[in-house]
């Protein structure tokens, strides 16, 4: 037999073979995946993150310790990252070598096969032995996804051409699951066609696009740091970035004087416009505008930010009272008209109200973000246990690989949600500091 590659000349396919009367692991013969992957340029980096070659062996048999024949059907999964496939004839010869060999139980046979196949494939291989009775209630189901076999298209060439794949690349981000029953590949050994069903889920572009966005955001943040530190592009930014889950929140302290919001630029500007209306600002400061802050500008029931946020609310805004700024109280010291003064006073009150509402809203968002993070952490803990549950069931041969992979994917999604929630906590905490014009102990 003429082979396409010299590495295949040692295979027993096409040769006369003797029946193996006892279990023999040396019958297995590998076929390197690189024979096909090198031509596609995907030997080192595959364009997918999960996958397996799945074999179903319908004629598994061995003897128990009393010499009684046992039968089973095996599901065998060769991980896509394994170095080798296993040549089909050698695979069948190997499985048949179990027929006249004694094993203690199902588990012993399963572990033996899994060990031998993993060594031959040089990768992860899972074996699940099922009693024949398991298939009594098994239904034939349709694969999830959109079948593309009924497209009204014309095909004129059946030769492999990798350039066609390049034309499929688009900037459009898509997420889809496609199914086809028309997968045909010619065997490297016999050049005969093998038919199969293929299910492909294309979501990798979305993941790559998100990664690019995150890298761009990080570069923008790095630029800001370089500007602040006056560093040139070729100078090292000697900063160690901690993992976001290790970043501790400083905490928000609302038990501080309301006067702290006087440091806000908008409040300070309104305060300046109002104070400029007086003939003698220094005299008025001692009477009703002490130390040029907002502490005396609020009602006596709102001496701290925390209590100010609990004042009666009307139409969704915090109500404040500034009786000492009434016209009758200060008209002797005002150098502008009553109308202009009232405009400045109202603007001043509105700025204070806006500032307090801003603090209130941001603090509420902060507490909500903390609750969300706590809930997601509990959810992730449950998902970890669910993944372990399905992994144990799969290793025990009572659950499908697909169920384990779905659970693992859900666990990873919840882990990403936790990272995003922690980021939201930090952002909302900083928003509170910003609305209070600083962090206060």
Swiss-Prot record:
InterPro entries: GTP-CH-I_C/QueF, OMF, OMP_efflux, QueF_N. This is Uncharacterized protein HI_1340. The lineage of its organism: Bacteria, Pseudomonadati, Pseudomonadota, Gammaproteobacteria, Pasteurellales. Belongs to the outer membrane factor (OMF) (TC 1.B.17) family. GO terms for molecular function: efflux transmembrane transporter activity; transmembrane transporter activity. GO terms for cellular component: membrane. Gene3D superfamilies: 3.30.1130.10, Outer membrane efflux proteins (OEP) (1.20.1600.10). GO terms for biological process: transmembrane transport.
């Amino acid at each position: 037999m003429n082979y396409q590659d010299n590495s295949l000349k040692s295979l027993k396919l096409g040769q006369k073979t003797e029946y193996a009367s006892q279990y023999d692991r040396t019958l297995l013969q590998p076929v390197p995946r690189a024979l096909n992957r090198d031509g596609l340029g995907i030997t080192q980096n595959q364009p997918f993150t999960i996958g397996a070659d799945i074999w179903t062996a319908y004629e598994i048999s061995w003897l128990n310790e009393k010499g009684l024949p046992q039968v089973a059907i095996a599901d065998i999964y060769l991980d896509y990252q394994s170095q080798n496939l296993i040549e089909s004839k050698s695979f069948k010869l190997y499985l048949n070598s179990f027929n006249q060999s004694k094993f203690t139980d199902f588990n012993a046979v399963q572990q033996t096969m899994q060990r031998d196949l993993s060594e031959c494939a040089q990768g992860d291989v899972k074996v699940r032995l099922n009693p024949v009775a398991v298939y009594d209630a098994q239904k034939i189901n349709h694969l999830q996804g959109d079948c593309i076999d009924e497209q009204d298209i014309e095909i004129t060439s059946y030769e492999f051409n990798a350039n066609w794949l390049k034309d499929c690349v688009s900037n459009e981000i898509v997420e889809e699951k496609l199914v086809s029953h028309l997968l045909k590949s010619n065997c490297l050994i016999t050049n005969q066609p093998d038919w199969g069903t293929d299910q492909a889920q294309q979501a990798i572009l979305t993941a790559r696009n998100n990664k690019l966005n995150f890298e761009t955001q990080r570069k923008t943040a790095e630029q800001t740091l370089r500007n602040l530190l006056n560093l040139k592009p070729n100078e090292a930014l000697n900063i160690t970035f901690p993992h976001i889950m290790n970043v501790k929140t400083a905490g928000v302290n609302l038990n501080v004087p309301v006067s702290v919001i006087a440091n806000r630029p908008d409040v300070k500007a309104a305060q300046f416009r109002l104070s400029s209306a007086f003939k003698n600002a220094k005299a008025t400061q001692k009477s009703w505008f002490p130390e040029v802050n907002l502490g005396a500008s609020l009602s006596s029931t709102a001496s701290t930010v925390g209590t100010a946020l609990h004042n009666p609310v009307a139409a969704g805004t915090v109500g404040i009272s500034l009786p000492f700024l009434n016209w009758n109280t200060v008209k002797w010291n005002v150098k502008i008209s009553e109308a202009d003064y009232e405009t400045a006073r109202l603007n001043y009150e509105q700025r204070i109200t806006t500032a307090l509402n801003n603090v209130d809203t941001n603090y509420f968002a902060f507490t909500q973000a903390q609750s969300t993070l706590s809930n997601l952490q509990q959810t992730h803990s449950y998902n970890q246990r669910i993944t372990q549950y399905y992994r144990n069931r799969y290793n025990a041969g009572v659950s499908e690989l697909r169920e384990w992979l779905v659970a693992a994917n859900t666990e990873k999604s919840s882990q990403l949600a936790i990272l995003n929630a922690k980021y939201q906590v930090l952002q909302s905490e900083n928003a509170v500091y910003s609305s209070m014009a600083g962090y206060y102990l």
